[in-house]
């Protein structure tokens, strides 16, 4: 199992992801600069947190035009697994791989805390080892993590069982307490919490480890 971690100007969680996948889980991991287009040999691609291209205009709005993202569209269409964490989730919505948008938090403040979560759907390989209704805690750190979508899109997400994670205590005003969603096929997951920061007891818990182990299934 080989993992690729996309790196944009302004990414700041790419090394954390590599530490989690390679250092904690022993998965060969390759960092991919935003100008690269070669995703061959990879089983999964992770879009990490940070502030891609400074998050100018809108979070993820510029990153969507990166050459690596155009290659990612084909990778995902062929069933490749894609995980977007925080800014990576924002990029996936801008790219159109996931519906909706991430906007300013309800209270207009940056939030950095541990968030209690509930697994809503375990049909995606990322979450199948948790089981539905599993409670877990993952760190969040974002200023624009409020998930928003139309009523029609929300119904489509519900009908497709594509709401993956909900906040138990909504910290940012996300519609329907949504913390993470998948595409219809389940191979693309976007979430605002940071599983890579919860992979070792020494750094604050291991609830994220199981999610990243979904890369191996």
UniProtKB/Swiss-Prot annotation:
Its EC number is 6.3.5.3, 3.5.1.2. Pfam families: GATase_5. One of its GO terms (molecular function) is phosphoribosylformylglycinamidine synthase activity. GO terms for cellular component: cytoplasm. PANTHER family: PHOSPHORIBOSYLFORMYLGLYCINAMIDINE SYNTHASE SUBUNIT PURQ (PTHR47552:SF1). HAMAP family: PurQ. Part of the phosphoribosylformylglycinamidine synthase complex involved in the purines biosynthetic pathway. Catalyzes the ATP-dependent conversion of formylglycinamide ribonucleotide (FGAR) and glutamine to yield formylglycinamidine ribonucleotide (FGAM) and glutamate. The FGAM synthase complex is composed of three subunits. PurQ produces an ammonia molecule by converting glutamine to glutamate. PurL transfers the ammonia molecule to FGAR to form FGAM in an ATP-dependent manner. This is Phosphoribosylformylglycinamidine synthase subunit PurQ. It comes from Parasynechococcus marenigrum (strain WH8102). The lineage of its organism: Bacteria, Bacillati, Cyanobacteriota, Cyanophyceae, Synechococcales.
């Amino acid at each position: 199992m080989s993992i690729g971690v996309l790196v944009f100007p302004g990414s700041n969680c790419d090394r954390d992801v590599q530490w989690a996948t390679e250092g904690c889980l022993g998965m060969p991991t390759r960092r991919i600069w935003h100008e690269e287009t070669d995703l061959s040999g990879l089983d999964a691609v992770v879009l990490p947190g940070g502030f891609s291209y400074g998050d100018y205009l809108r979070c993820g709005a510029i990153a969507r035009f990166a050459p690596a993202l155009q290659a990612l569209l084909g990778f995902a269409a062929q069933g490749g697994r894609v995980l977007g964490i925080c800014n990576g989730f924002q990029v996936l919505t801008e790219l159109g791989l996931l519906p909706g948008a991430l906007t300013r938090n309800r209270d207009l403040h940056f939030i950095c805390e541990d968030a209690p979560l509930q697994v809503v759907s375990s049909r995606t390989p990322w979450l199948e080892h948790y089981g539905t209704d599993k409670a877990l805690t993952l760190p969040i750190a974002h200023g624009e993590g409020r998930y928003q979508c139309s009523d029609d899109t929300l119904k489509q997400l519900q009908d497709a069982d594509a709401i993956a994670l909900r906040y138990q205590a909504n910290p940012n005003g996300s519609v329907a307490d949504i913390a993470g969603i998948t595409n219809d096929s389940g191979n693309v997951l976007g979430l605002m919490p940071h599983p890579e920061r919860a992979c070792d007891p020494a750094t604050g818990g291991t609830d994220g480890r199981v999610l990243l182990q979904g890369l191996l299934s």
